[in-house]
């Protein structure tokens, strides 16, 4: 679903374990790592999209996770020009995302990347909370930084110091959904 400004509505997913690490996934047949994310279909709620994408990309369902928080507003990023399909209508210039912070409450053996016909990832790893900023494609780095800074106080109970390299002003804070 592309809005009037050219942004595709999307949910982003930060899955954490009991060590406060996050699940980072490797794009199929690429040397590119990212957090799970996916589009919100027409008429679909953010939560419906979250659970659909969680199942399609990671093989998890509602009973495997606990929702901790979400970003309260859309976070946007623009595609580089080479990524924009100018002949496609409507033209999509980027994505606007709402991000959910989840905790895995089941065994990690439930994580299955090949549950659906359109497999997006071929590997995954638990990594340090801030690591996705370093590993994601360059044009997504600012949104990853904003999102992780917004969600960190929830995961770390306001006890975690933001690394110095990410100390630019925060654009939003998280809404706590579950405790």
Swiss-Prot record:
Gene Ontology terms: biological process: mRNA catabolic process
Protein name, UniProt field: RNA pyrophosphohydrolase
EC code: 3.6.1.-
Cofactor: a divalent metal cation
Motif position, Nudix box: 38-59
CDD domains from the UniProt entry: NUDIX_Ap4A_hydrolase_plant_like
A Pfam family that the UniProt record links to this protein: NUDIX
Keywords assigned: Hydrolase
PROSITE patterns xrefs: NUDIX, NUDIX_BOX
Record keyword Hydrolase present: yes
Function summary: Accelerates the degradation of transcripts by removing pyrophosphate from the 5'-end of triphosphorylated RNA, leading to a more labile monophosphorylated state that can stimulate subsequent ribonuclease cleavage.
GO cellular component, one term: cytoplasm
Molecular function per GO: mRNA 5'-diphosphatase activity
InterPro entries to which the protein is assigned, alphabetical: NUDIX_hydrolase-like_dom_sf (IPR015797), NUDIX_hydrolase_CS (IPR020084), NUDIX_hydrolase_dom (IPR000086), RppH (IPR022927)
Record family assignment: Belongs to the Nudix hydrolase family. RppH subfamily.
């Amino acid at each position: 679903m592309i809005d009037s400004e050219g942004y595709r509505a999307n949910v982003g997913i930060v899955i954490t374990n009991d060590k406060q690490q996050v699940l980072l996934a490797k794009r199929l047949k690429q040397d590119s790592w990212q957090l799970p994310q996916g589009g919100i279909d027409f008429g679909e709620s953010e939560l419906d999209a979250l659970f659909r994408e969680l199942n399609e990309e990671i093989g998890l369902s509602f009973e495997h996770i606990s929702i901790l928080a979400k970003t309260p507003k859309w976070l946007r990023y623009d595609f580089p020009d080479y990524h924009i399909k100018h002949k496609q209508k409507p033209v999509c210039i980027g994505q606007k995302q709402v991000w959910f912070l989840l905790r895995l409450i089941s065994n990690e053996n439930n994580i299955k990347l090949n549950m659906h016909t359109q497999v997006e990832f071929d590997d995954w790893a638990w990594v340090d909370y801030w690591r996705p900023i370093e590993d994601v494609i360059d044009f997504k780095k600012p949104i990853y930084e904003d999102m992780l800074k917004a969600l960190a106080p929830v995961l770390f109970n306001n006890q975690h110091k933001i690394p110095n390299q990410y100390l630019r002003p925060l654009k939003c804070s998280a809404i706590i959904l579950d405790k």
